[in-house]
Amino acid sequence: MWILEKKNIFFKIIHIKSSRKFDFSNAIRIVLLPFSSNCCRNSYTVNNGTFTGRQIYTSICKSRIPPCLKGKNGKTTKSESEPMSQKHLKYVKKYINKVRILKK
């Protein structure tokens, strides 16, 4: 698992195809976790290194799964995910290449 840090922003790479070279195009899923934000609204997919605005967040945030991500059967459903705002998208794209990579 990789944690990328930029000030108070953490990017969690859920899965990377190749461990030889780190690249966002190898990431299946990326989760943006600002400390003061609702985790439900800060999860983005990565396709070919480009952010898209739909969530496929299935990881655990802050030791628990946010209520808005739990379906009737306790599983995440696509219909419950929210699109990311353009403001967030621009902010992420601006800093994504300037972060410090930490390995955990």
From Swiss-Prot:
Top-level taxon of the source organism: Eukaryota
Name this protein carries in UniProt: Uncharacterized protein C1687.23c
Annotated GO CC locations: mitochondrion
